[in-house]
């Protein structure tokens, strides 16, 4: 539970904004603001999956339709038929390509690194119990605690024109990370130096425009397969979870009427996820401004917004957290 969201300048750690979270989110949104490590979230979700209904190591190669069902095909020759097939197969979705044809992703010119710093073994007196956003020219760094405060998660994004692979699992090194942030504040450099050398990964950030439709016949998309988004609003996993909840409610409401189910699902989810996609794209431009004049205007805008509404969550992002997926049946 972070105390606040804090914006800092890349070179002198000067404050850009301070948004209280722990003290304000329950009153504003009826819930706490949590940080969770992705692996822990996966483990929690996996607890509710029945092993007898799960097949692993099955590579989907496509989806086709008959009159009343969708049929998924797999690399081993097996097929799977269902009233509804949901492609939740990520940014390189085979199901999306089968439904709508291949769509090449656009490389944004940004590289992202992720790393973990073990706080138990290496105390970090300079790291506050906040979510910290260090904003600099052509890059930014985000830090926040995970694993009950025993580790600090570090996400660093910088401009880089030389990336071509859309992958989350490419290993990197401390030196490569340090080289991407010359002249940054000593606290950031120290974090990079303390990172677990076996846990530093990098990936290129690829973008796609919002889709006009997700569903066709008896198949649809969910999560990154439907709306891959840049990480500048930290909403990728949240949007996928919301998708899943709304789709389940639509199925409960309309039963085997797959047409009405998918119509309700898209009507509820597509406007919201498209807005998040586009706002995340614009947020990246704001974070990575480089000219002195741009930085001055941006920082003045941060301060003005802070004075106007000290309890604002994030930077004009209240609308992200005000949404309540559990009320979706009222809108079907």
Feature map (PLM): residue ranges:
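Active-site-adjacent segment of FAD-dependent monooxygenases/related oxidoreductases
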Residues: 1-48, 286-287, 294, 301
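A short alpha-helix-loop-beta-strand transition element characteristic
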Residues: 1-8, 106, 126, 194
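Conserved FAD/dinucleotide-binding core of flavoprotein oxidoreductases
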Residues: 14-42, 69, 75-80, 116-202
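Glycine-/small-residue-rich beta->alpha transition segments that form the dinucleotide
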Residues: 38, 65, 82-84, 88-93, ...
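Glycine-rich beta-alpha-beta "Rossmann" dinucleotide-binding loop(s) and their flanking helix/strand
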Residues: 51, 97-112
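A conserved short coil-to-beta-strand element within the FAD-binding core of flavoproteins
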Residues: 56-70
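Conserved mid-domain beta->alpha element of the FAD-binding
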Residues: 86-87, 91, 113, 143, ...
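Flavin (primarily FAD) binding-site architecture
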Residues: 87-101, 119
């Amino acid at each position: 539970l972070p105390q606040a969201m804090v914006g800092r300048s890349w070179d002198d750690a000067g404050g850009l904004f301070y948004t209280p979270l722990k003290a304000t989110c329950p009153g504003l949104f009826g819930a706490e603001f949590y940080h969770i490590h992705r692996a822990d979230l996966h483990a929690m979700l996996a607890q509710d999956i029945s092993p007898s209904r799960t097949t692993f190591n099955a590579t989907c190669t496509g989806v086709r339709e008959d009159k009343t069902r969708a049929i998924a095909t797999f690399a081993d020759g097996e097929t799977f038929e269902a009233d509804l097939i949901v492609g939740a197969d990520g940014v390189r979705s085979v199901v999306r390509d089968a439904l709508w044809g291949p769509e090449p992703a656009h490389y944004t010119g940004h590289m992202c690194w992720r790393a973990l710093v073990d706080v138990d073994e290496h105390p970090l007196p300079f790291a506050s119990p906040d979510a910290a956003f260090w904003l600099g020219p052509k890059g930014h760094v985000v830090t926040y605690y995970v694993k009950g405060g025993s580790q600090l998660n570090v996400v660093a994004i910088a401009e880089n024109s030389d990336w071509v692979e859309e992958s989350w699992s490419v290993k990197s090194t401390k030196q490569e990370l340090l080289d991407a942030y010359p002249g940054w504040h000593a606290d950031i450099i120290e974090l990079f130096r303390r990172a677990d050398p076996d846990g530093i990964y990098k990936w290129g950030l690829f973008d796609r425009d919002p889709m006009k439709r997700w569903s066709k016949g008896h198949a649809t998309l969910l999560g990154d397969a439907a709306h891959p988004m840049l990480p500048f609003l930290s909403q990728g996993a949240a949007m996928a979870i919301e998708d899943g909840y709304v789709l389940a409610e639509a199925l409960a409401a309309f039963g085997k009427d797959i047409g009405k189910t998918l119509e309700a699902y898209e009507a509820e989810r597509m406007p919201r996820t498209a807005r998040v996609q586009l706002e995340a794209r614009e947020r990246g431009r704001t974070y990575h401004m480089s000219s002195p004049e741009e930085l001055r205007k941006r920082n003045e805008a941060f301060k003005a917004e802070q004075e106007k509404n000290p309890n604002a969550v994030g930077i004009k992002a209240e609308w992200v957290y005000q949404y309540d997926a559990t009320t979706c049946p009222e809108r079907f």
